[in-house]
């Protein structure tokens, strides 16, 4: 199944619901960053949560960044996404191994630790807005739900899951987000709570072959709703050799001269996708000459 999300509205416009399958992009992140299982689970949940949050963006030029700043051994997670379904991210320390939590689950909460969650929206008309809240569990889904309720004043339920196989590869990943407006009837609130309990593990649902539409059909059982959009999801990266060369041009004259004189050239690694760009001393010298010509 290809990765995608769906966006729906229900209960007379009082309920907004989103569901996504993110197995392929989470596996791509695992492959690029060589993450160990608990880091894979944490990064996959963060990528999925970022994709769901970005589904609220309305302009092709808008983007959203999620930063999980915890004091656990993962040392933080950073993800971003745009309105077109492009999602990317990385974990600071990909090689973390912890004892499993209860029932043998990967201990994402301990790996993330305590700290803060930051969401930055770059909007077409309103500019840049950053909200934040404390991490309540480090499990990502609970932290996002708390953030949305506390910082954005939108009561929300969030479910995120990643199932990792014995070989470390991603078997299934996905999630949902349900947001309630103030006028949501109490009966619909109760029904949603019951439905979410019936859905259970979202990663198990994806592993069993449920599509985003089918996940929403369970979450919104008994509530009139309409699917408004389907959005493909992928893990591309905007880095390029040209952008890396531009980063070298930001070095000062002394640093550039040192790279040329030592004959080492330069090497840059993209944090988001782990791509490595290498430049010879001659290429660095050309950058240096170009800077002098502009002076």
From Swiss-Prot:
One of its GO terms (cellular component) is cytoplasm. It is found in: Cytoplasm. Pfam families: HSP33. Under oxidizing conditions two disulfide bonds are formed involving the reactive cysteines. Under reducing conditions zinc is bound to the reactive cysteines and the protein is inactive. It comes from the Bacteria. Keywords: Chaperone, Cytoplasm, Disulfide bond, Redox-active center, Zinc. One of its GO terms (biological process) is protein refolding. NCBIfam families: PRK00114.1. Belongs to the HSP33 family. Redox regulated molecular chaperone. Protects both thermally unfolding and oxidatively damaged proteins from irreversible aggregation. Plays an important role in the bacterial defense system toward oxidative stress. This is 33 kDa chaperonin.
């Amino acid at each position: 199944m290809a990765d995608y999300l769906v966006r729906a509205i229900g209960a007379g416009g009082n309920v907004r619901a989103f569901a996504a399958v993110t197995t392929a992009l989470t596996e791509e992140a695992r492959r690029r960053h060589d993450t160990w299982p608990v880091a894979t689970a944490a990064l996959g949940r963060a990528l999925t949560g970022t994709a769901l949050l970005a589904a609220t963006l309305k302009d092709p030029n808008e983007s959203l960044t999620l930063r999980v700043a915890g004091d656990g051994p993962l040392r933080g997670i950073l993800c971003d996404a745009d309105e077109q379904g492009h999602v990317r991210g990385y974990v600071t320390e990909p090689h973390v191994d912890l004892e499993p939590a209860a029932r043998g689950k990967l201990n994402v909460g301990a790996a993330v630790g305590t700290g803060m969650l930051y969401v930055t929206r770059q909007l077409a008309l309103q500019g840049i807005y950053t909200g934040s809240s404390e991490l309540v569990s480090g499990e990502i889904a609970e932290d996002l739900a708390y953030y949305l309720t506390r910082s954005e004043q939108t009561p929300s339920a969030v479910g995120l899951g990643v199932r990792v196989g014995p070989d470390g590869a991603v078997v299934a990943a996905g999630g949902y987000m349900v947001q309630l407006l103030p006028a949501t009837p109490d009966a619909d609130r109760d029904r949603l709570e019951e439905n979410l309990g019936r859905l259970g593990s979202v990663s198990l649902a994806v592993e069993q072959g449920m599509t985003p539409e089918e996940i929403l059909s369970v979450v919104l059982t008994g509530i009139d709703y309409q699917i408004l959009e389907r959005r493909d999801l992928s893990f591309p990266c905007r880095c390029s050799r040209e952008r890396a060369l531009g980063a070298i041009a930001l070095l000062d004259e002394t640093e550039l001269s040192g790279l040329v004189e030592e004959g080492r050239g330069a090497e840059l690694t993209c944090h988001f996708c782990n791509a490595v760009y290498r430049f010879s001393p001659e290429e660095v010298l050309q950058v240096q000459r170009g800077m002098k010509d502009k002076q």
